[in-house]
């Protein structure tokens, strides 16, 4: 029985899954919008939301914890310099997952993942 098992396996080993979610989180925090499959998007939301909450607390310990989870200095700088202050008034719900049709090759359901308070494109 798989009652209350928390995460999706996504047909990957645990190390592959962790690396993939870390890379996707870094891409989302850098570009603020990505397109991926729907199950990956739903799992990605569980990784990114705590990172943004961490970015709202500007302490050295929070920065070190964020670097430990992302392993990318540029992402940490953006997280604490731009994204954390942008979401100070919002208590969670920083990531939006929208259904985005189906992939051409294998008909996999796609999702558009974006940050909620994204600045308007010019």
From Swiss-Prot:
**One of the record's GO molecular function terms:** structural constituent of ribosome
Record-level GO cellular component terms: cytosolic large ribosomal subunit
Q: Which Pfam families match?
A: Ribosomal_L17
* Any one Gene Ontology BP term: translation
Q: Keywords, A to Z?
A: Ribonucleoprotein, Ribosomal protein
Q: Which domain of life is it from?
A: Bacteria
Matching entries from InterPro entries are given as: Ribosomal_bL17 (IPR000456), Ribosomal_bL17_CS (IPR047859), Ribosomal_bL17_sf (IPR036373)
Q: Which PROSITE patterns match?
A: RIBOSOMAL_L17
The protein's assembly and partners: Part of the 50S ribosomal subunit. Contacts protein L32.
Give the PANTHER family listed for this entry: LARGE RIBOSOMAL SUBUNIT PROTEIN BL17M, RIBOSOMAL PROTEIN L17
- Which family would the database say this protein is a member of? Belongs to the bacterial ribosomal protein bL17 family.
Protein name from the UniProt record: Large ribosomal subunit protein bL17
**Gene encoding this polypeptide?**
rplQ
């Amino acid at each position: 029985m798989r009652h209350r098992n928390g995460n999706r396996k996504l047909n990957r080993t645990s190390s592959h899954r962790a690396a993939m979610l870390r890379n996707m989180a870094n891409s989302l925090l850098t570009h603020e919008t990505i397109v991926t499959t729907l199950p990956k998007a739903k799992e990605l939301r569980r990784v990114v939301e705590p990172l943004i909450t961490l970015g709202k607390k500007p302490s050295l310990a929070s920065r070190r914890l964020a670097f430990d989870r992302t392993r990318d200095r540029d992402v940490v700088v953006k997280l604490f310099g731009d994204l954390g202050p942008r979401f100070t008034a919002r208590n969670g719900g920083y990531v939006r997952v929208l259904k985005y049709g189906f992939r051409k090759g294998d008909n996999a359901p796609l999702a558009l993942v974006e940050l909620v308070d994204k600045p308007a494109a010019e």
